[in-house]
């Protein structure tokens, strides 16, 4: 459970870290703050649009291998930030992270519930949510402070290093976890024909896009 909580921590810290570092990133890459905001909104668009199809595409994958792959992709994209020299190269790394994010949260809660001891599924889910909460109240502020002191790219690199350590921990402690899902991309048209689900997806997308739009420019305003 601790390993899964740490995984949630690094993903959520990375998700919101650009909010506090947006002015630094814009100045470093010679872009306006408003244009640099696409790093955040683009991330949100990718997660909103790709979560469902990618979850279906990977539905039959063994869960441990999939999670380790996602953490590996996440870490590599963060390490690559040290070498970005333009907005678009940075954007490419964030798209990679967003794709990993899209699948990560589709498997994390079910995986936590399965890995929890019998009768303690709620504890497993609480551990994952605890990682999310700690990321919001501690990880993002510390990452932002580190970015101001040592450089925004270095802050992302540290998150990548943390993700690599989590990967090694989960490789060691997490047992094999065969998929129990019967979904596939072929079921996507059927899902999209259900009005209730479409309404739920629409509300979720609008909520997340509104949240990211509001968060994006809090730092410059403050």
Regions found by a protein language model. Name each.
Residues 3-36, 51-54, 214-219:
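Extracytoplasmic
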Residues 16, 44-52, 136-137:
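Residue-level signature of mid-helix packing/kink "hotspots" within the transmembrane helices
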Residues 87, 93-131:
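Cytoplasmic helix-loop-helix junction between adjacent transmembrane helices
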Residues 160-180:
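C-terminal membrane-cytosol helix-exit motif in multi-pass small-molecule transporters
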């Amino acid at each position: 459970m601790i390993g899964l909580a740490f995984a949630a921590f690094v993903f959520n810290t990375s998700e919101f870290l650009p909010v506090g570092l947006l002015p630094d990133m814009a100045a470093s890459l010679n872009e306006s703050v408003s244009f640099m905001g696409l790093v955040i909104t683009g991330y949100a668009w990718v997660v909103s649009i790709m979560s469902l199809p990618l979850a279906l595409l990977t539905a039959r994958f063994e869960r441990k291998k999939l999670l380790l792959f996602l953490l590996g992709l996440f870490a590599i994209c963060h390490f690559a930030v040290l070498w970005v020299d333009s907005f678009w190269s940075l954007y490419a790394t964030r798209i990679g992270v967003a794709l990993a994010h899209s699948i990560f949260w589709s498997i994390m809660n079910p995986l936590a519930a399965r890995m929890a001891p019998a009768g303690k599924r709620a504890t497993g889910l609480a551990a994952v949510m605890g990682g999310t909460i700690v990321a919001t109240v501690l990880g993002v502020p510390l990452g932002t402070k580190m970015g101001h002191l040592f450089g925004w790219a270095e802050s992302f690199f540290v998150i990548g290093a943390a993700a690599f350590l989590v990967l090694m921990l989960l490789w060691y402690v997490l047992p094999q976890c065969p998929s129990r899902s019967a979904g596939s991309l072929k079921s996507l048209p059927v899902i999209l024909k259900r009005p209730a689900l479409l309404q739920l997806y629409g509300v979720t997308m609008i909520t997340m896009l509104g949240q990211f739009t509001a968060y994006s420019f809090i730092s410059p305003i403050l």
